[in-house]
A protein has these predicted regions:
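General beta-strand structural signal in soluble alpha/beta enzymes
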Residues: 44, 65-68, 97-99, 106, ...
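Cofactor-binding active-site loop characterized by glycine-rich and histidine/acidic residues
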Residues: 25-167, 185-191, 196, 201-203, ...
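Short coil/turn connectors at secondary-structure junctions
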Residues: 11-13, 17, 38-39, 60-64, ...
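Glycine-rich ThDP/TPP pyrophosphate-binding loop and its adjacent helix/strand module
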Residues: 113-297, 307, 473-536
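Conserved acidic/glycine
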Residues: 1-51, 58, 238, 244, ...
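Cofactor-binding beta-sheet edge motifs in enzyme active sites
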Residues: 343-344, 446-469, 473, 478-479, ...
């Protein structure tokens, strides 16, 4: 849409002003409820609405947005069901997460929204995976991932920017620099004066934007979207300010009063209103009418939500939400043709057959392309399946696993290879806090398989020989597989690739070339969680 103050009709400008004002009016009501003891917590985005609303308005509805906890305006601009949204924010039955959360740790696939986890910058690699899926399918869409200034010091920020640049992904990295972490000023945590300067280090444009000017935000995002679609990623730094506490309980005593007052004078809604009135595209009376209309709607909706029951659940319901339903296994026929093969051959055969059967299967990891992986499991794959489906990654275990999540959200079947299982420790956050919780939080199937060569016995030393499968076996939401025979390796890997849940597939390096056994030549799957009786 055109810049709002250049819109052709008063109706256009009024609709935009309503979109800009709505999150403010909702927040004002929530803060009132908080003071009354009728709401337990709130993370305010007051003063930052221009970024959330401006970005969401400028992007196409088909584009992915990965917002943060202060971006209520993204959800309202994407026209999320208001009754469910209010139930979510107020912890009542009818919310999006069944009471497991009362903020934005969920996604809405129908709105192309992917919510955050609390670990800063963790969703940026996910945006890379979404971008790769869009590129793989040759879709004219982008992914826009929000991040705070503090989050730009996290490793996931740098891993994601590097991956997006190396792969030329259609991703916009949008940083809200609001001056503070929790209480630490940005200049005590971030070395460069402009975070946008990081773009040059990753061969992408880095643009500083006045985040309190909604027209500037829309213009920057519109241009970034065009660049991302045609040439690759863009880094936008939106300069703004957090005029309230990190959350309401912490207050703002650590912020100089004059600094808060200075930024209140730059309030984005007031700035737009003044410009719209000066340009004659929207009268003050019309703006007052919009506010009155919104306040009445919010009051009515809030009172309705307060009459809804508190969230209740049962242990059975909670356990039942951890995993998506798995397909039934298809074991081999008793008289199936078999071949005597090594353990590694069985793994390779399972992966190759799956890629032949299903174009959605994508393999990525360090050295997996022409080199074929350190243990040569993917040897010859790039020649058969091409670089779009067999992709080398940088040394970014966290970034690669997060990208796998993004690919899975978009319906692809990623297989992420760890060079050695020892290095999976660098990706634990993505595995335990992101992959493992996604279905529980918002019902999204996450069919990601992480292959990891593990164990000792080959003289590889202390950092290439560890066995850490027990770490993950204690994590709800993960399926952990450790095959012992070639037959099991092939069948269980095919099962993993058909799973709508994250699977950690540990392959013992000592077994790769030292164990042989009969393996059915055709495709088959074996059930998870059922012991095979080898001897009696």
């Amino acid at each position: 849409m055109d810049v709002p103050t250049d819109a052709s009709t008063d109706t256009d400008v009024r609709a935009f002003y309503r979109a800009l004002l709505e999150p403010r009016v909702i927040e004002e009501k929530m803060l009132t409820l908080l003071r009354q003891g009728r709401l337990e917590k709130w993370f305010s985005g007051i003063g930052q609405e221009a970024i959330a609303v401006g970005a969401a308005w400028a992007l196409d509805e088909r584009d992915y947005i990965l917002p943060m906890h202060r971006n209520l305006g993204v959800w309202t601009t994407r026209d999320v069901d208001r009754e469910r949204l209010f139930c979510q924010l107020m912890g009542r039955e009818g919310g999006f997460t069944n009471g497991r959360d009362r903020t934005f740790h969920f996604g809405l696939p129908e709105k192309n929204l992917v919510g955050m986890i609390s670990h800063m910058a963790a969703m940026l690699p996910v945006a890379c995976g979404l971008g790769q899926a869009l590129r793989y399918r040759e879709e004219d869409r982008v992914a826009c991932a929000f991040c705070g200034d503090g989050g730009t010091r996290e490793g996931d920020f740098h891993e994601a920017l590097n991956l997006a640049s190396v792969w030329d992904l259609p991703v916009i990295f949008l940083v809200e620099n609001n001056g503070y972490g929790l209480s630490t000023p940005t200049d005590e945590a971030v070395a460069p004066a402009d975070i946008a300067d990081a773009g040059a280090g990753y061969d992408m444009p880095g643009v500083v934007v006045d985040g309190n000017d909604v027209v500037a935000v829309m213009d920057a995002v519109t241009k970034a979207r065009a660049h991302a679609r045609a040439e690759g990623p863009v880094l936008l730094e939106m300069k703004t300010f957090r005029v309230r506490g990190h959350e309401e309980a912490s207050g703002t005593a650590y912020v100089p009063d004059e600094l808060i007052e200075e930024w209140k004078e730059k309030d984005p809604i007031d700035r737009f209103a003044e410009q719209a009135a000066a340009d004659g595209v929207l009268t003050r009376d019309a703006m007052d009418a919009v506010r009155a209309e919104l306040e009445a709607e919010v009051d009515e909706r809030t009172e309705w939500v307060l009459q809804q029951p508190e969230v209740t659940s049962t242990p059975e319901a909670e356990r039942g939400a951890v995993f998506a339903p798995s397909p039934e296994p298809a074991p081999p026929a008793p008289d199936a043709e078999t071949e005597e093969v090594r353990f590694i051959d069985a793994v390779q055969d399972a992966l190759r057959q799956a890629m032949r059967d299903d174009n959605s299967v994508i393999v990525m990891g360090q050295d997996v392309a022409e080199y074929g992986g350190v243990f040569k499991v993917t040897d010859g794959f790039v020649e058969e399946f091409g670089r779009e489906r067999v992709r080398n990654t940088p040394i970014i275990e966290s970034g690669a696993i997060g990208a796998g999540l993004g690919l899975a959200v978009e319906g692809l079947t990623p297989v992420v290879e760890m060079q050695y299982a020892d290095f999976i420790s660098c990706g634990v956050n993505q595995i335990v806090n992101n992959l493992a919780t996604t279905h529980y939080r918002w019902g999204q199937p996450v069919g990601v398989t992480v292959r990891a060569p593990f164990g000792g016995g080959i003289g590889a030393g202390p950092f290439h020989s560890q066995s850490m499968e027990a770490w993950f076996a204690h994590t709800p939401g993960l399926k952990v597989v450790v095959p012992a025979t070639p037959r099991d390796a092939k069948g269980l890997l095919r099962t993993a690739l058909a799973e709508p849940n994250p699977v950690l597939f540990f392959e013992h390096k000592k077994l790769y070339r030292s164990v042989r056994g009969p393996v059915p030549t055709g495709a088959y799957t074996l059930p998870f969680g059922e012991a095979r009786v080898a001897r009696e």
